[in-house]
A protein has these predicted regions:
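Short alpha-helical elements
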Residues: 1-103
Length: 103
């Protein structure tokens, strides 16, 4: 099996702090009200849970928008935390600005 065929879940240690946060917080429930900020029309974007987790990660790691973009591109634990797979496209820096304004 090659690296890209691996499951991201297998590549992040079981005791990683981000996993602990995922086990403590029900993000679906937490973001229930935020779903109202999204329309069902138009092309789909990133799931609101992923966006909210990305903003939380940006805050916890003290990242600028561009740093958050790069962090999610390069950091496997960050991808796992936000619900992105190894090959998934992650948000560009402008996404973080847009999401904060929306919510």
């Amino acid at each position: 099996m090659t690296f890209l065929e691996s499951n991201i879940d297998e590549l992040v240690t079981a005791n990683h702090p981000y996993r602990k946060i995922l086990g403590l917080i029900d993000f679906k429930e937490l973001t229930k009200e935020l779903r109202k900020c999204y329309s069902n029309l138009g092309r789909g974007g990133y799931p609101i849970e992923s966006g909210f987790k990305a903003l939380l990660l940006q805050y916890m790691e003290d990242l600028s928008n561009r740093e958050a973009q790069r962090f999610l591109e390069e950091n496997l634990a960050g991808k796992l935390f936000c619900g992105f797979g190894l090959k998934d496209q992650t948000p560009e820096h402008t996404y973080f600005v847009d999401l904060r304004q929306r919510i």
